[in-house]
């Protein structure tokens, strides 16, 4: 291996050192660098292009369902935060505060937003007067800061991160529930149809829901190292924020009523899940749906065939561009084909075209898939049409591998020892009957650093959650009459235990 190849390649093992491997892929594939301040990163163009692809999909779906983009200040007055006590208690340890402007002390501390409910709700109160103003839906693409003390990991855990946060107000509880479920479905669609990652939909236990929320629902993705990633959350806020910030409206009979609100967000943690799920010991692996370049064309020539090969490759590149394919023709001098193969594998381009004198003579193209190196030969005349089939095949390979991994790593347990032993040996998700008591989760968390990442959603999930909010405990059908795996009391739901990012 040349010095260039040695510097270019991944040296850590995904299987044996997943943390070091992940950090190396993120840096060497040009996604991000570490900032001089601990807990912050510099997002490079290739990494930001992945975020833009996520934005483009979600933003279109949001707008198709009545959401408008807006922007609110990044600083929140302290007394605004204090108006919703659960927000204060939930986020205070993570809030970064501004206390000085220039050389002057501020009259009131300003929080660097950890989330924006407390700065958006007062304006919803101003903008909503009548039932005709509802539903009101706004979203903003921004960054937030949470001064977490835990070890940081690019895209998974950083003090500042990019995300979108949607905020809505509704006339009825039923409409707010429909909104909460719709946004969760859109996050599910993003992972399943765009990122190539199968996810589970669930509800957070009460002790782990968003501060001030009635219910928090999430999508959860399983990583190859057996840990779960919370991929996006949708919160039914009930009337807590509306009460705190006086979001009221006149109904059709001119009676004053309190609105119901929701909030929902997805961060660049999705990029971390994308990298961790699909990439390998050769570098980044990306699904064609989000890859900045979907196809790279690498010419292979001797001096006497250079002109013919490069002309052939350039013509194919032009045809692919006309088909809407994001293609790069790598005609650099000074880099041999082997170096280019390794570099584009490291950078995660899903499909590689190899073109040499034989391809030119036979009017063909050699096509190589990034995930598994599968190589096929296609007729030149059909390549502009066939390329989409190859891109779909690559996506299916990535999704199917992730789906198989998920299916193999959801296990069941009916007692405490089995929960601990299964997670300790295999990782992944362990389904167990649970009584709903936080102390039972704490026993598992203290022993093995695993927690309840979700309670699965059934077909009637919204009605179930609403019933529980009214004080009814509704056993799930598959655990009716069973005992909690930890304490032995009556089980009222299924819990998914896992270690998580």
Curated annotation (Swiss-Prot):
One of the GO BP terms on file: prolyl-tRNA aminoacylation
Record keywords, A-Z: Aminoacyl-tRNA synthetase, ATP-binding, Cytoplasm, Ligase, Nucleotide-binding, Protein biosynthesis
Reactions this protein catalyses: tRNA(Pro) + L-proline + ATP = L-prolyl-tRNA(Pro) + AMP + diphosphate
MF annotations from Gene Ontology: ATP binding; proline-tRNA ligase activity
A single cellular component GO annotation: cytoplasm
InterPro entries for the chain: aa-tRNA-synt_IIb, aa-tRNA-synth_II, aa-tRNA-synth_II/BPL/LPL, Anticodon-bd, Anticodon-bd_dom_sf, Pro-tRNA-ligase_IIa, Pro-tRNA-ligase_IIa_arc-type, Pro-tRNA_ligase_II_C
UniProt subcellular location: Cytoplasm
Family affiliation: Belongs to the class-II aminoacyl-tRNA synthetase family. ProS type 3 subfamily.
UniProt comment concerning the protein's domains: Consists of three domains: the N-terminal catalytic domain, the anticodon-binding domain and the C-terminal extension.
Subunit comment: Homodimer.
Function per UniProt: Catalyzes the attachment of proline to tRNA(Pro) in a two-step reaction: proline is first activated by ATP to form Pro-AMP and then transferred to the acceptor end of tRNA(Pro).
Protein name: Proline--tRNA ligase
Species this chain originates from: Halobacterium salinarum (strain ATCC 700922 / JCM 11081 / NRC-1)
Name of the gene encoding the protein in the UniProt record: proS
């Amino acid at each position: 291996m040349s010095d260039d190849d040695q510097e270019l390649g991944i040296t850590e093992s995904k299987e044996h050192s997943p943390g070091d491997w992940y950090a190396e892929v993120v840096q060497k594939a040009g996604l991000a660098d570490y900032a001089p301040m601990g807990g912050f990163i510099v997002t490079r163009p290739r990494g930001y292009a992945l975020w833009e692809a996520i934005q483009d999909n979600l933003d279109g779906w949001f707008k198709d369902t009545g959401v408008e983009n807006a922007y609110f200040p990044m600083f929140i007055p302290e007394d605004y935060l204090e108006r919703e006590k659960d927000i204060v208690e939930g986020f205070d340890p993570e809030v970064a505060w501004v206390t000085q402007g220039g050389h002057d002390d501020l009259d009131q501390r300003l929080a660097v937003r950890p989330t924006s409910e407390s700065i958006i709700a007062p304006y919803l109160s101003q903008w909503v007067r009548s039932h005709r103003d509802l539903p009101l839906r706004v979203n903003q693409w921004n960054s937030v800061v949470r001064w977490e003390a835990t070890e940081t990991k690019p895209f998974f855990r950083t003090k500042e991160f990019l995300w979108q946060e949607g905020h809505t107000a509704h006339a009825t509880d039923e409409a707010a529930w429909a909104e909460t479920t719709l946004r969760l479905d859109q996050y599910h669609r993003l992972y399943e149809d765009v990122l190539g990652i199968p996810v589970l939909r669930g509800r957070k236990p009460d002790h782990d829901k968003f501060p001030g929320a009635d219910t928090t629902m999430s999508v959860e993705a399983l990583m190859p190292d057996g840990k779960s990633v919370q991929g996006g959350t949708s919160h039914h806020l009930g009337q807590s924020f509306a009460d705190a910030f006086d979001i009221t409206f006149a109904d059709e009979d001119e009676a004053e009523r309190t609105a119901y609100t929701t909030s929902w967000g997805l961060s660049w943690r999705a990029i971390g899940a994308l990298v961790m799920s699909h990439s390998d010991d050769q570098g980044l692996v990306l699904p064609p749906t989000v890859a900045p370049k979907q196809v790279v064309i690498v010419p292979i020539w001797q001096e006497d065939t250079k002109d013919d090969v490069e002309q052939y490759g350039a013509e194919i590149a032009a045809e692919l561009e006309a088909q809407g394919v994001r293609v790069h023709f790598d005609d650099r001098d000074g880099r041999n084909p082997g170096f280019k193969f390794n570099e584009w594998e490291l950078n995660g381009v899903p499909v590689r075209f190899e073109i040499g004198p034989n391809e030119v003579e036979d009017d063909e193209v050699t096509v190589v898939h990034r995930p598994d190196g599968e190589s096929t030969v296609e007729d030149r005349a059909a390549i502009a049409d066939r390329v989409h089939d190859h891109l779909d095949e690559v996506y299916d390979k990535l999704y199917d591998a992730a789906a198989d991994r998920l299916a193999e790593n959801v296990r069941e347990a009916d007692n405490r020892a089995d929960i601990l032993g299964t997670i300790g040996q295999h990782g992944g998700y362990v389904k167990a009957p649970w009584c709903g008591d936080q102390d039972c989760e704490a026993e598992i968390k203290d022993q093995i650093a695993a927690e309840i990442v979700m309670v699965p959603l059934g077909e009637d999930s919204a009605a179930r959650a609403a019933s529980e909010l009214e004080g009814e405990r509704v056993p799930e059908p598959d655990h009716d009459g069973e005992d909690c795996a930890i304490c032995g009391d009556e089980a009222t739901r299924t819990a998914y235990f896992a270690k998580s990012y």
